[in-house]
């Protein structure tokens, strides 16, 4: 053994007997590689032989543990002089391999770790079942096994797999039997569920006759048989069968037409035992119409044969007969005026917990004849706006509430404290063990205590108590106490009296004292003994306040941290003694660190201001009683999310008290404090707490059933007794008792959807904590929480007697609903912020600019347009919106950035004049920059002013300026000019954060908020949840059932977020709580902006919303301006060179073959995608107007494909005449002779895809008017195909930006390529890019092949786009340089003559921070070694190696050598 190796063995304290083994005789350290940045040490050992497996594991574990203490990761491998290939040793190491990455992947380990291995003919042979002996494992996993065995010292082995028939048959048999058991259990479970569902149905009504078809006589008997056929539950079908009959609901339908004209209806049905895929063929349209009843939501009876679908490989019914059936929905059968009101209902806005939309909840209550229904989502009010609108529509009162998380502001450390010296006090530190957590329903089985003085135990108390019944397995497992411990124990009352004597003249101490003291007091009260009145210290709260930096303050973690012995946690005597030891550590630290000497100081001086963060949460339901209450509710929600958020939104009790006006409080569910007090402290304690509330909630016994499983309540009788106790609490506290349903879904069969959603949260969620331990441990079942009718609710409470049940279910809930006033949740008007003299300023800026361009007096056409627009803008209070946008654009312009407009704002000439948009919506015209003379073309013959021929002003000879896109104002603010303006602006991505801050600066921090969004579970995500549930809970679902469950679980709120550029501005004469609560996005309390709590769409017609979006175009323009010094405003929109790009490549000096495309569109915004390039190739645009058409066609839906494209190909129309942008419809129809109002209405119907959805009468009226004015039929037919259209103003703004970029591509190419790669390129491969044309083209060909085979990754697709531009640049004679350690910038590409030098950030895996660090470090001095580059430059070893491979580092030396133990520890 070498000295160095021996030193290492001493360091890791390797056992001497192992060190003396023969394997260690010549042990040595061959090499150590030290990676300082990653703190990884690689050891390479030499041994005489392969180590015994126990020795290897000991060496491995001690190395890891020792170096972990110094925050160093360790790996090692072994070279063995002699290798023993005995089966036992090989088998042991083979199994050990699966404990090491990457062999420990789940699929490899589960399939291979238990297999047998042998060594034969110089090969390691693995005997495997046939189904794992495949190429996947051979290719992806066996090489890893070879490497791991080599690291163990076996050298490079050849591994082969052989199929073991016996093993294959055995495992197959086990799998089949396990699967059959799963299916059998699923069948039984679902059949029972169906029986339960049927039992809840109201009496069957006589079915309405199904629609009859003219079948031939010979089908009559078959139809009769169909009517009487036995219905088969879907769950029972496992194989192909004939003439099966199902009844169920259709939940998915897809209709297709084959090339031969036949139709196929693929649909899915469920009967709630399972689901099935079905298909029905129809030979023609007439037969297809017979099956219109196959629609989503329809209930059908179907008969057909079950066959395996050759495409989906799933069992599918080929339907032969189908008829619609009556589905008997649940109804509330109580008479009018005798129906309950549900006051505790969750919607899908209760995060990952409830299913119904607020609309469906309200619709169900209204359908049942209920006069009101409450919304009580968990800690949020995001369903309020939709609930408000739906309730008004349904004619039902919506009661707006929430289920809040209430906490005490400062949970006390000491109860009933007195003036007492802590150092001189005597303490009784006690603990109790019980059969459950309920003092009223469970029993004491042990009381133990240590009496302590100055840190010493002076006396002990330890008594078991016989509860009079056998202990449950759970209690024994948790506490370690058995029935044997309790034999011969003293009676409870004797122990209680003895313990009271033991505790005299002392301070009581317990960990989580509220539980122990509550349990003791409940038992004292039950036996007429005095309750605890002496001071109590809770060591749990003591620890939380003394050591807030600790994450866990349970007894177990604390004893480990302070090295206090706790041998038998959950036995009272051991827990009490350990708690006592901790107490005196706490007292010492409190005295030394905080000066705490007196008992009174614990609460006054030590309890932290933010102790609410650790306080135990209790639920309460809060309801809005009036408009004042609504605003207070919004404030509470805001405070709970902004100021008091800790894991969940919390409302401290004092905060609730300060905002309680206009609110009513209920005691909520089993997580409420009154229910908890009844369960754990007794009725007296519950009465005291109940006085704080306005009513007591009781829920159906089924809701409390999980408490029985968790052993908090003994049985059904125990649940009923708790409910009676709650009623007694209400009586004694003089509070009404109301029966609520805790609704989480509407129908009983929807329970499974909630189950899937909740279980997807994993065991970290409280609701999923398992009962018991071990493999069989499962979470408690979820309660039956569907929306119950009055009859169902009365049945649930029948045990109370008819009169009392009716009182709590009907009378009291109706009375409460009557106390609630109607409130306005969403305001009916727009409230814009106030800017002094906004109207005057907008008008002044408009006329000032108009006079500057068009002269004074203005041309009539300009004057009339301005007057028309200002009348609308100023008259409807929109001036402040215009002015705010102008101020934002102006500020960004002053910082050197252009701002592009989006949407239809370019339809407003006032917006153009005050600088919001560059788009001029007037008809095409000339205007003289010198004398302001102008000429307007108003006959529609010219599509864009930029296409007018150049000519001089006839008055002064100055060359005319050209402008005007002919866009009507109506497309922005509606025909009457009263639509709230939606001004969307494209700021440079670099300047967007500054623009956002400008809003705050203009309007004030307290009035500007990011527009909030709500993220829900997508159906694909829900599909994953279903598959996870299926896996984790031993379920087996066919594909159609998975689809149904995924659809049912989708739509539930999962998180919140923010619009990428939306800023909501609250009027400065109101506050945000007049409109919405506020919060942080995704509960990120470190976020710099607060968001609206409501989805911004819910209030976008009430407050100003500014869309300040980030976009690459303004950033690119700024970059080009910085590189060239050219003002982009001066770039002409009709440059011949730029227009030549759209017809060929000659202007670039290359051929189409060189760059792989027939035009010069590569890298041009709006026109560079494959789709638009194809459109350009087909249409050959030559004018700005035609480019606008292309932009509109490419952004619309069903405007180009199957529409304009065909018209152009067939020669029916041209690019100029087809419908391209929405505004063109109105302009064209007015030029054709239609009235402006009708032209506008037709445009609106077409652009929204409503042409075929409006009534035939309305549509025919439009068609007649168009034909009367000679509008061609092809135009009318084209209107009917359109689903969505792009605004012309949006197209004009985008095209104008694109042409400016294109100008640089043509006239200043190296600058264009520099800007493109700096800003737009998403992926780089620097070695390929700098290796020249051949390398670039070869890589492009490689990716092209992968694309054809659908093998290209997203990164490769992005890279291909980059390489297209690189290829074009190189073909044009420019060069792409290598990354240079001393010349490259961190972020931007650099121009060196005709060469581009890439920045550091272009290197894969090198982020912005490291790039900036390298540039900063090189300014401080040359890098002398790779180690220095890693240390000073912050580059990882991987990045340094990559730079070295690319030749960037030249001959830079390697890392400095380190001694093995330098810097160790």
Curated annotation (Swiss-Prot):
The record's catalysed reaction(s) read:
DNA(n) + a 2'-deoxyribonucleoside 5'-triphosphate = DNA(n+1) + diphosphate
Gene Ontology BP annotations: DNA-templated DNA replication
Q: Name one GO cellular component term.
A: cytoplasm
Keyword hit for Hydrolase: yes
For this protein, the record's Gene3D superfamilies field holds: 1.10.150.870, 3.30.1900.20, 6.10.140.1510, Metal-dependent hydrolases (3.20.20.140), Nucleic acid-binding proteins (2.40.50.140), PolC, middle finger domain (1.10.150.700), Ribonuclease H-like superfamily/Ribonuclease H (3.30.420.10)
State the compartments where it is located. Answer: Cytoplasm
Question: What are the alphabetically sorted keywords of the record?
Answer: Cytoplasm, DNA replication, DNA-directed DNA polymerase, Exonuclease, Hydrolase, Nuclease, Nucleotidyltransferase, Transferase
Domain Exonuclease: residue ranges: 427-583
Molecular function GO terms recorded: 3'-5' exonuclease activity; DNA binding; DNA-directed DNA polymerase activity
- Keyword Protein biosynthesis assigned to the entry: answer is no
Q: Write the Enzyme Commission number(s) for this entry.
A: 2.7.7.7
NCBIfam families registered for this protein in UniProt: dnaq, polC_Gram_pos, PRK00448.1
What is the annotated role of this protein in its UniProt record? Required for replicative DNA synthesis. This DNA polymerase also exhibits 3' to 5' exonuclease activity.
Which family does the entry's similarity section mention?
Belongs to the DNA polymerase type-C family. PolC subfamily.
Protein name, entry field: DNA polymerase III PolC-type
Q: Which organism is it from?
A: Streptococcus pyogenes serotype M5 (strain Manfredo)
């Amino acid at each position: 053994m070498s000295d160095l190796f021996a030193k290492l063995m001493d360091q890791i304290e390797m056992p001497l007997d192992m060190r003396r083994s023969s394997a260690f005789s010549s042990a040595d350290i061959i090499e150590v590689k030290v990676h300082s940045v990653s703190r990884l040490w690689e050891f390479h050992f030499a041994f005489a032989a392969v180590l015994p497996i126990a020795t290897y594991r000991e060496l491995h574990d001690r190395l890891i543990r020792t170096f972990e203490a110094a925050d160093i990761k360790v790996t090692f491998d072994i070279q063995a002089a002699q290798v023993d290939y005995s089966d036992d040793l090989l088998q042991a190491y083979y199994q050990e391999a699966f404990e090491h990455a990457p062999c420990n992947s789940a699929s490899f380990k589960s399939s291979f770790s238990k297999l047998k291995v042998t060594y034969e003919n110089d090969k390691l042979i693995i005997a495997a079942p046939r189904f794992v002996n495949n190429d996947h494992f051979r290719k992806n996993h066996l090489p890893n096994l070879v490497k791991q065995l080599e690291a163990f010292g076996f050298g490079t082995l050849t591994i082969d797999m052989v199929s073991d028939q016996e093993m294959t048959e055995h495992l197959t048999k086990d799998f089949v039997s396990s699967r059959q058991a799963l299916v059998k259990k699923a069948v039984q479970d679902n059949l029972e569920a169906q029986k339960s569902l049927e039992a809840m149905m109201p009496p069957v009504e006589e079915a309405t006759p199904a629609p009859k078809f003219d079948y031939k006589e010979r089908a009559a008997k078959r139809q009769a048989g169909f009517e009487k056929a036995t219905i088969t539950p879907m769950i029972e079908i496992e194989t192909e069968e004939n003439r099966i009959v199902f009844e169920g609901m259709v939940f998915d339908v897809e209709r297709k037409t084959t090339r031969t004209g036949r139709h196929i209806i693929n649909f899915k049905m469920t009967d709630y035992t399972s689901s099935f895929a079905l298909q029905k063929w129809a030979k023609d349209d007439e037969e297809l119409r017979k099956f219109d009843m196959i629609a989503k939501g329809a209930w059908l009876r179907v008969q057909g044969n079950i066959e395996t679908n050759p495409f989906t490989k799933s069992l599918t019914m080929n339907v032969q007969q189908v008829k619609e059936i009556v589905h008997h929905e649940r109804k509330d059968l109580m008479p009018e005026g005798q129906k309950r009101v549900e006051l505790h209902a969750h919607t899908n806005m209760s995060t990952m917990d409830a299913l119904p939309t607020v609309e469906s909840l309200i619709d169900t209550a209204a359908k049942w004849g209920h006069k009101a229904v409450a919304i009580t989502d968990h800690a949020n009010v995001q369903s309020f706006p939709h609930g408000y609108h739906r309730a008004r529509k349904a004619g039902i009162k919506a009661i707006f509430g929430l289920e809040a998380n209430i906490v005490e502001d400062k949970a006390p450390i000491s109860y009933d404290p007195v003036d007492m010296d802590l150092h001189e006090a005597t303490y009784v530190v006690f603990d109790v063990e019980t059969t459950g957590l309920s003092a009223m329903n469970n029993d004491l089985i042990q009381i133990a205590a240590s009496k302590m003085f100055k840190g010493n135990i002076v006396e002990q108390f330890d008594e078991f108590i016989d509860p009079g019944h056998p202990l449950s397995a759970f209690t024994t497992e948790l506490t370690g106490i058995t029935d044997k411990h309790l034999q011969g124990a003293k009676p409870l009352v004797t122990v209680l009296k003895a313990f009271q004597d033991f505790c005299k003249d002392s301070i009581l101490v317990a960990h989580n004292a509220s539980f122990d003291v509550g349990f003791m007091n409940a038992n004292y009260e039950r036996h007429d003994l005095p309750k605890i009145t002496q001071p109590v210290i809770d060591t749990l709260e003591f620890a939380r306040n003394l050591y807030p930096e600790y994450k866990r303050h349970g007894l177990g973690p604390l004893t480990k941290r302070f090295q206090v012995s706790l041998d038998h946690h959950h036995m009272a005597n051991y827990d009490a003694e350990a708690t006592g030891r901790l107490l005196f550590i706490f007292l010492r630290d409190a005295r030394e660190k905080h000066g705490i000497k007196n008992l009174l100081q614990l609460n006054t001086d030590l309890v932290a201001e933010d102790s609410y963060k650790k306080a135990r949460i209790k639920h309460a339901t809060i309801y809005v009683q009036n408009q004042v209450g609504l605003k207070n509710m919004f404030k509470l929600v805001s405070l709970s999310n902004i100021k008091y958020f800790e894991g969940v939104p919390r409302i401290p009790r004092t905060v609730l008290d300060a905002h309680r006006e206009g609110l009513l409080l209920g005691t909520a569910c089993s997580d409420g404090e009154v229910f908890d007090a009844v369960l754990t402290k007794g009725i007296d304690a519950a009465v005291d707490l109940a006085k704080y509330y306005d009513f007591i909630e009781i829920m159906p016994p089924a809701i409390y059933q999980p408490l029985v499983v968790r052993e908090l309540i003994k049985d059904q009788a125990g649940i009923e007794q708790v409910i009676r106790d709650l009623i007694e609490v209400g009586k004694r506290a003089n509070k009404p008792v109301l029966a609520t349903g805790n609704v989480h879904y509407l129908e009983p069969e929807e329970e499974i959807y909630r189950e899937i959603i909740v279980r997807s949260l994993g065991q970290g969620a409280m609701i999923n904590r398992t009962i018991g331990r071990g493999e069989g441990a499962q979470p408690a079942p979820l309660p039956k929480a569907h929306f119950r009718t009055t009859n169902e609710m009365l049945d649930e409470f029948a045990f109370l007697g008819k009169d009392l049940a009716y009182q709590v279910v009907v009378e009291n809930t109706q009375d409460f609903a009557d106390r609630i006033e109607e409130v306005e949740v969403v305001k009916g008007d727009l409230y814009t912020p106030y800017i002094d003299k906004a109207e005057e300023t907008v008008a002044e800026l408009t006329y000032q600019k108009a006079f500057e361009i068009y002269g004074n007096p203005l041309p009539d056409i300009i004057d009339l347009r301005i007057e028309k627009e200002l009348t609308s803008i100023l008259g409807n209070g929109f001036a402040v919106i215009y002015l705010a946008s102008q101020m934002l654009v102006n500020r960004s312009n002053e910082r050197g950035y252009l701002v592009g407009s989006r949407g239809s704002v370019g339809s407003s000439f006032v917006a153009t004049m005050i600088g919001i948009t560059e788009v001029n919506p007037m008809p095409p015209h000339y205007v003289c920059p010198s004398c302001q003379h102008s000429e307007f073309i108003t006959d529609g013959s010219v599509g864009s002013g930029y296409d007018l021929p150049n000519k001089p002003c006839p008055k002064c000879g100055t060359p005319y300026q050209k402008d005007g896109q002919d866009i009507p104002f109506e497309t922005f603010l509606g025909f009457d000019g009263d639509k709230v303006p939606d001004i969307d602006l494209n700021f440079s991505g670099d300047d967007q954060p500054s623009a956002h801050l400008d809003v705050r600066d203009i309007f004030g921090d307290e009035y500007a908020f990011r527009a909030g969004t709500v993220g829900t579970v997508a159906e694909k995500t829900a599909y994953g949840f279903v598959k996870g549930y299926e896996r984790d809970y031993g379920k087996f679902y066919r594909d159609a059932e998975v689809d149904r469950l995924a659809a049912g679980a989708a739509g539930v709120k999962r998180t919140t977020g923010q619009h990428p550029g939306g800023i909501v501005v609250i009027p400065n004469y109101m506050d945000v709580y007049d409109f919405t609560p506020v919060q942080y996005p995704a509960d990120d309390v470190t976020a710099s902006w607060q968001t609206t709590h409501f989805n911004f769409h819910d209030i976008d017609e009430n407050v100003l919303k500014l869309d300040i979006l980030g976009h690459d175009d303004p950033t690119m323009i700024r970059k080009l301006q910085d590189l060239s010094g050219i003002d982009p405003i001066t770039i002409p929109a009709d440059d011949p060179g730029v227009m030549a790009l759209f017809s060929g490549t000659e202007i670039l000096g290359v051929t189409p073959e060189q760059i792989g495309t027939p035009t010069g569109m590569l890298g041009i915004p709006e026109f560079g995608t494959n789709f638009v390039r194809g459109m350009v190739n087909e249409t050959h645009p030559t004018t700005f107007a035609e480019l606008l058409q292309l932009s509109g066609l490419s952004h619309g839906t069903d405007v180009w494909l199957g529409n304009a494209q065909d018209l152009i190909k067939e020669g029916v129309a041209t690019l100029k005449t087809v419908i391209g942008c929405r505004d063109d419809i109105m302009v064209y129809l007015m030029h054709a002779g239609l009235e402006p109002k009708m032209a506008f209405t037709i445009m609106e119907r077409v652009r929204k895809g409503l042409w075929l959805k409006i009534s035939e009468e309305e549509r025919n009226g439009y068609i007649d008017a168009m034909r009367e004015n000679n509008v061609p039929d092809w135009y009318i037919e084209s209107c009917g195909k359109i689903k969505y259209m792009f605004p012309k103003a949006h197209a004009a703004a985008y095209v104008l930006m694109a042409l400016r970029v294109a100008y640089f591509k043509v006239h200043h190419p190296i600058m264009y390529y520099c800007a493109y790669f700096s800003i737009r390129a998403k992926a780089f491969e620097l070695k390929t890019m700098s290796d020249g044309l051949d390398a670039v083209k070869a890589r492009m060909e490689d990716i092209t092949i992968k694309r054809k085979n659908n093998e290209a990754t997203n990164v490769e697709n992005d890279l291909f786009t980059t390489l297209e531009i690189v290829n074009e640049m190189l073909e044009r004679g420019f060069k792409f340089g290598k990354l240079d350690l001393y010349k490259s910038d961190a972020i931007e590409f650099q121009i060196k003559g005709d060469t581009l030098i890439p920045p550091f950030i272009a290197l894969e895996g090198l982020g912005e921070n490291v790039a900036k660090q390298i540039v900063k470090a090189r300014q401080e001095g040359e890098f002398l070694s790779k180690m220095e580059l890693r240390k000073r430059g912050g580059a990882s070893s991987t990045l340094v190696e990559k730079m070295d491979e690319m030749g960037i580092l030249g001959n830079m030396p390697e890392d400095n050598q380190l001694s093995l133990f330098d810097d160790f520890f």
